[in-house]
UniProtKB/Swiss-Prot annotation:
InterPro entries: Uncharacterised_YbeF (IPR020258). One of its GO terms (cellular component) is plasma membrane. It is found in: Cell membrane. It comes from the Bacteria. It is a multi-pass membrane protein. Keywords: Cell membrane, Membrane, Transmembrane, Transmembrane helix. Its main location: membrane. This is Uncharacterized protein YbeF. The chain crosses the membrane at residues 4-26, 31-48, 52-74. The gene is ybeF.
Length: 82
């Protein structure tokens, strides 16, 4: 497994999964995007190079969007009684 597999397959899927699960558990839409940004920044400067910095921001924005969508879905399900 090389760095590109990690950067463009495993990391995005992991961030998406953790964003959904973390938002369901913590009910805080900002926690998981911040955590994904920190993880991506650490990986940028340890495993990847500075060109991955843009992807770190993109993955954090995707995490923020998924966190808000998850929070809305959880609240709607709670309101409907399911």
């Amino acid at each position: 497994m090389d760095e590109l597999d990690i950067a463009f397959f495993i990391l995005p899927l992991g961030i998406m999964l953790l964003s959904i699960v973390g938002t369901c558990i913590c009910k805080n839409p900002y926690l998981m995007p911040m955590l994904s940004l920190v993880i991506s920044l650490v990986l940028t400067f340890t495993i990847f190079n500075q060109s991955f910095l843009g992807w770190a921001v993109v993955y954090s924005l995707v995490s923020l969007a998924l966190s808000y969508i998850t929070l809305i879905v959880v609240r709607k399900r709670k309101e409907s009684g399911n």
